[in-house]
Amino acid sequence: MRQIAEMRKEVSQHGFDVRMMEVPGMKVAIAGDGEVNYLFMLLPFRDKFKLKKRDVWLFKKLSYKFQARPFMVTFDKMLSFYPLHALEEAGEHFELDIRNSRGLMFSFDTIVSEQLQQRLVV
């Protein structure tokens, strides 16, 4: 629950509305500001995650339907946002290794900053 509260607080500071979605087997939140949407898969903090392929494909399908950028979110001392390409295929499932994926980790500030830069270019 603390992770959800922290995520809502950080995302709301940037003017985004956040809502939790009921998706079987996953904690998913959608955030939007009227121009851009983000879809977040909330994960408890661990060093390594094993995610079912069907759950990842469902998450990708939802992000496509909502025209949202998908991210996986973990919370230890701070929120960490990982793009889906941080996942590694491992047979029947995908794995997210936090230690190996640190270079792909973003803060929400960075994500919003990149989005604002894209808006200015267009």
Swiss-Prot record:
Q: Which UniProt keywords apply?
A: Plasmid
Query: What is the name attached to this protein's record?
Result: Uncharacterized protein ORF6'
What is the organism of origin for this protein?
Answer: Methanothermobacter thermautotrophicus (Methanobacterium thermoformicicum)
**Phylogenetic placement of the source organism:** Archaea, Methanobacteriati, Methanobacteriota, Methanomada group, Methanobacteria
